[in-house]
Amino acid sequence: MGMATYAVVDLETTGNQLDFDDIIQIGITFVRNNQIIDTYHSMIRTNLEIPPFIQALTSIEENMLQQAPYFNQVAQEIYDKIKDCIFVAHNVDFDLNFIKKAFKDCNIQYRPKKVIDTLEIFKIAFPTDKSYQLSELAEAHGITLANAHRADEDAATTAKLMILAFEKFEKLPLDTLKQLYYLSKQLKYDLYDIFFEMVRQYDAKPLDKSYEKFEQIIYRKQVDFKKPTTNYNGSLKSLYSKAVDQLGLTYRPQQLYLAETILDQLMHSEKAMIEASLGSGKSLAYLLAALMYNIETGKHVMISTNTKLLQSQLLEKDIPAMNEALNFKINALLIKSKSDYISLGLISQILKDDTSNYEVNILKMQLLIWITETPSGDIQELNLKGGQKMYFDQKIETYVPARHDVHYYNFIKRNAQNIQIGITNHAHLIHSDVENSIYQLFDDCIVDEAHRLPDYALNQVTNELSYADIKYQLGLIGKNENEKLLKAIDQLEKQRILEKLDIAPIDIFGLKASMNEIHELNEQLFSTIFTIINDSDVYDDDIHRFHNVFTFETKDILKDLHAIIDKLNKTLEIFNGISHKTVKSLRKQLLYLKDKFKNIEQSLKAGHTSFISIKNLSQKSTIRLYVKDYAVKDVLTKQVLEKFKSLIFISGTLKFNHSFEAFKQLFNKDVHFNTFEVNTSLQSAKNTSVFIPSDVASYQYKNIDEYVASIVSYIIEYTTITSSKCLVLFTSYKMMHMVQDMLNELPEFEDYVVLTQQQNQNYKIVQQFNNFDKAILLGTSTFFEGFDFQANGIKCVMIAKLPFMNKHNAKYWLMDSEFTSTFKEYVLPDAVTRFRQGLGRLIRNENDRGIIVSFDDRLINSNYKNFFEQTLENYRQKKGDIQQFGKLLRQIQKKKK
């Protein structure tokens, strides 16, 4: 890191408008030689009002600035401290531009010689982090950040993380460090100087034995699993007793009963359905059952979960805790398909790719560091998104395996016999094919959160043709000899001529003409689809914010598909008899496109269920064509039911109408299931009230203003009485945003933070919601499950409408052919399940107290009300107007105290 001094700066401001907002706090942490050597901190007075959101975010109130200096009073002092330093900040543009503007207003010209963005550093140094938000980085790396969004603490935390990153860089093998230096020249800021100094000062030594080398890549040596050591002669009951005692948990007979039930089903190779509701301790129960089964039989068990979060919890928290508590060494491993694991040949190809793109360059640097760390080579560890993911997926699709390639999937296969517990998720479980030998090694499977299986199966059987994807894939080939793969082919042809390579001549001009025609044919195809949309009945899917066309003629689409497939075939003929690796890459890309079009063509010809989706009705580029290739029931039967000798489905919401029959109907094979119900140990009836307003008008689709106003009135009543946070669940974005707009205009919510669901931001929003004392979270179907609501006071969940999927929802359309009565057999059970999941957001432990408000009068007035009423049997129910609602809140508040 050298002897340079780094000024790590963080600012808090009244907003993000450079020309209108002011700095209200500055924190600077000075770093030299990987040590914090000094700090500076000051509140900054402003004549502007501090918005309520900023006050809530920073905990800085206007009275705290009354004795603080204005910036012009400390500007020279700050400038003198940082003028010779390397300027560092997290998301550096924001802080640098604000401080330069503030200096300029004081007639000080500040131009740092070097600038470092820690967002850039942390993406490279910590490639597997799920988020690069400062608070989440701090938590992930064990750094205490008590008051996020306070400049002094944020600056210190950023500095500590930067030191961690630099120390990590310095420990890397020299060859890796050199490659990082060369790649860093393409970054936005001055990180290349840092890498240069690290390379220059590197203490040369032989490559550590924990590493191996493939071509130019240094990677972590793979260490095979040892056979498991779990010598145990006792019963499951004694194993359970020891586990809960060592883990400091409460001994719960129902949890033991659940574990014993699972073990019994495994031992007898049975198929079972178990509804184990909230509080039954499913995870520990099935882990102990799987472990005991392995001890007694030597067989290993596959556990499939719904989310990556639960996967991580099992592998990184629950199983290590069990190992420590029981003094065992349980071999557990994440199991996926071959395409989910990296090969070093693929990384080598990516590093050699001359694509000039900032995100791709960051990805290359991330790969170099990640491969020195990862024991598994699981690509999802990288959490790729956006352009990086599209680029990476394309590279996988077109990768031609290198000779002597090192593929991490082979390591997983080699060690599968020594695995006691395999962890996977529903998507991989359903996606795995017959040739996937890892899954074939498991005879027994436990499926947690089994009620979600149909959704993953539907995704699996639905094929998609997207304008954006095809345009991107074609762009990777290029239109002329100066672009992408065409450029590589052009260079190969020149090399053939100059060096007299032993390959056939390549018709570059013919290839270029063919590619231009393919581009034009693709435009014609999507123009045809665009015309169909404009001439058809279009239905809004408000949940997913798309417009759908369900009924349309496919004749013109098939004509265009045939033309583009024919042209792709003729283009592929250009490369007949040529086996050079550059040609193979282009052929593979063309074959990928051909297969994409061909699969859609075959499905449409066969009359499979299809629909067209468009995000923006005026933009052809947002079109997607979907075709359902197989029945969900067929896939669930083949990929799940028939794959294992013993199979146990577990969920808190597996039953409908007091029966498991609805779930059984998801399989098209008549198989006997043993069924069990494990009641929760939480006394939800004592803790939870369900309030059904009697003064809210019935929902009217064409006029929802009155309905929305009623919801807002109840939110006001709740927050006024309790000053607590509230989760409001909607079935449409339209209604959610109407409520949001009204809340933001009302003075009652000036000291509240109103958070709204945003695409790809759910994790961040949930964290914010749980951190604020006064917050209202507005969300749609995503938040009906899998969301841990944390609050110190009363907890409240308001359900705007019962969670029925709209008749014009794509799921409804795609599943319609699989049921005699789609509403009764699919839509109604799905709505009841989601409603039950929504109720489950409230009471997460024995100490929780709260209230559920359901505004939809169909809960008590519809023909199917009894199905929902069954879900409320364990809750105290109350009907009344808003005054009675307030009275109930005061009673609950009194009990909470």
Swiss-Prot record:
Q: Where is this motif: DEAH box?
A: 448-451
Domain named Exonuclease is located at 8-161
Look up and give the organism this protein is from. Answer: Staphylococcus aureus (strain NCTC 8325 / PS 47)
Record's keyword annotation contains DNA-binding: no
Function per UniProt = 3'-5' exonuclease.
Domain (Helicase ATP-binding) spans 241-496
Q: Look up keyword Membrane and say if it applies.
A: no
Drop me one GO molecular function for this one. DNA binding
Protein name, entry field: 3'-5' exonuclease DinG
HAMAP family associated with the record: DinG_exonucl
